[in-house]
A protein has these predicted regions:
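Peripheral, non-catalytic segments flanking oxidoreductase cores
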Residues: 1-366
Length: 366
C-alpha cells in the first residue's frame, strides 16, 4: 500500500499546531546509559501522590467486553447495545473483540513499533518534535521546567485525514513502518466509525449527529522503559482523561501497566489477547451531557520489563463545536457548548492532571 500524503488545508494542518511540549531527556537512553539509577538521577520523575488512592486487585472488577459482531447482527444487537450503554455510562471504558481488524495488520504494527524503539537514539531523533508542534518523537505535556515528568518516550503522528500529514515526522525505518501505520490507521478509523454508530444508538440519537466526531485521528506510540530503582514511585503516564471523542488502544506486548480509576480506586487492566481497549473521551462526555463518562487512567512501570502501546485518538472537525444533547426538555444541561479548537488548546496547554480540563466545560454550580 502506498502511503498517502498531501499538502492539506489550513484547518487540517492546524490540528498538530494546537500545542507543544518542552524538550526533556530521553528516558530510554537514560536507562540504557545509567544502569542502576540513583534517587538524585530520577528525582524529577518521582510522583509524590502516586499512592493517594488504593490499587485494587485485578479481579476486583471485570472490564466490560463488547463483541462488535453481536452489534452487527440483527439477532443480538439490542442485547449488545445494552452492554455498550452500560460500559460507557458506568465504566467509560471497555474491551472490544471481533473488531474486524485483520491479524496481519495488528502483527505488522506491533513488530514495526518495537523495531522503531530499538533503533539508535540518533536515528529516532531525526523525527524529533519541533517547537509548536504536537507531532514527532519525544515526550508530551511538558509545559514547565519544574513539573514532574513521566517515565516514557513516544512518537505522535497525525494520520487522518491524509491532507493533514507531515511526512517528515514519519519514520523511514524500519522500511515497513509507514505502510504498517497506514494500514492500521485506516482499520482503526473504520472501527471508530462503527462504534460511533452504535454509541449514537445507545443515546437514542441519529447516527448523523456523531458522524463528524471521528474525522481526525492522531496515533501515539508509547515506550515505557523498566525502572529497576523505584518502579513504584514513577509513572509512565500521569493520571488523566483523554481530550478526544473516542480513544482506541492496542497493547503491543504482554506487559501490564494500564490502570483505570473507578469508584475512587485504581483497577489494573489485563486486556484479553484478542481485544482492543476503548475509552470515552472528554468530548463524548460533554456531548452526552454527562451520561457517558471519560475515564481517568494512568500507566504504571514494571521493574524489569519494557511496555509498549499505540493509542488512536479520534476527534471532531477542527472548526467544529461540541454541544450537549439533551434527552428531554426537562433534562438539565451540565456542560456548555465548547469549540473543538478551544478545548484542544486548553487540554494541550497543561500538564496531565486528572480530569481538570473537563472542569472548563462544566456549567457553574454543577
Amino acid at each position: 500500500m502506498e502511503v498517502e500524503a498531501a499538502s492539506g488545508s489550513a484547518g487540517e494542518i492546524r490540528w498538530s499546531k494546537l500545542g507543544t511540549s518542552l524538550p526533556v531527556a530521553n528516558v530510554q537512553a537514560l536507562v540504557a546509559s545509567a544502569g542502576e539509577l540513583t534517587v538524585d538521577q530520577i528525582e524529577r520523575y518521582i510522583q509524590p501522590d502516586i499512592d493517594a488512592h488504593a490499587v485494587l486487585p485485578e479481579h476486583s472488577g471485570e472490564v466490560p467486553v463488547i463483541d462488535l459482531s453481536n452489534l452487527l447482527s440483527p439477532e443480538s444487537v439490542e442485547a449488545e447495545a445494552a452492554k455498550l450503554r452500560f460500559a460507557c455510562a458506568e465504566w467509560g471504558f471497555f474491551q472490544v473483540v471481533n473488531h474486524g481488524i485483520p491479524d496481519e495488520v495488528i502483527t505488522d504494527i506491533k513488530q514495526d513499533i518495537q523495531k522503531f524503539f530499538q533503533l539508535p537514539l540518533e536515528v529516532k531523533n531525526a523525527y524529533a518534535q519541533r517547537p509548536g508542534d504536537l507531532q514527532g518523537y519525544g515526550q508530551a505535556f511538558v509545559v514547565s521546567d519544574d513539573q514532574k515528568l513521566d517515565w516514557s518516550d513516544l512518537i505522535a503522528l497525525f494520520t487522518q485525514p491524509t491532507q493533514g500529514r507531515d511526512m517528515s515526522y514519519w519514520p523511514a525505518q524500519p522500511d515497513t513502518f509507514r505502510n504498517s501505520v497506514e494500514e492500521y490507521s485506516l482499520e482503526v478509523m473504520k472501527l471508530a466509525h462503527s462504534l460511533n454508530v452504535f454509541i449514537a444508538k445507545t443515546l437514542d440519537v441519529a447516527p448523523e449527529l456523531l458522524a463528524d466526531k471521528h474525522v481526525a485521528q492522531f496515533l501515539r506510540m508509547s515506550y515505557y522503559p523498566p525502572c529497576t530503582s523505584m518502579p513504584k514511585k514513577v509513572l509512565g503516564f500521569s493520571p488523566h482523561s483523554d481530550g478526544s471523542f473516542l480513544t482506541i488502544l492496542l497493547e503491543i506486548n504482554s506487559v501490564q501497566g494500564l490502570q483505570i480509576r473507578r469508584s475512587g480506586a485504581w483497577i489494573p487492566v489485563k486486556p484479553r489477547h484478542d481485544a482492543l481497549l476503548v475509552n470515552v473521551g472528554d468530548l463524548l462526555e460533554i456531548m452526552s451531557n454527562g451520561k457517558y463518562k471519560s475515564i481517568e487512567h494512568r500507566v504504571t512501570i514494571n521493574a524489569h520489563k519494557e511496555r509498549l502501546s499505540i493509542s488512536a485518538f479520534h476527534v471532531p472537525n477542527y472548526d467544529g463545536i461540541i454541544s450537549p444533547i439533551l434527552g428531554t426538555t426537562e433534562e438539565k444541561m451540565l456542560y456548555k457548548t465548547v469549540g473543538v479548537e478551544e478545548y484542544a488548546r486548553l487540554y494541550f496547554a497543561n500538564k496531565l492532571e486528572g480530569k481538570r480540563a473537563l472542569d472548563y466545560a462544566k456549567l457553574s454550580g454543577i
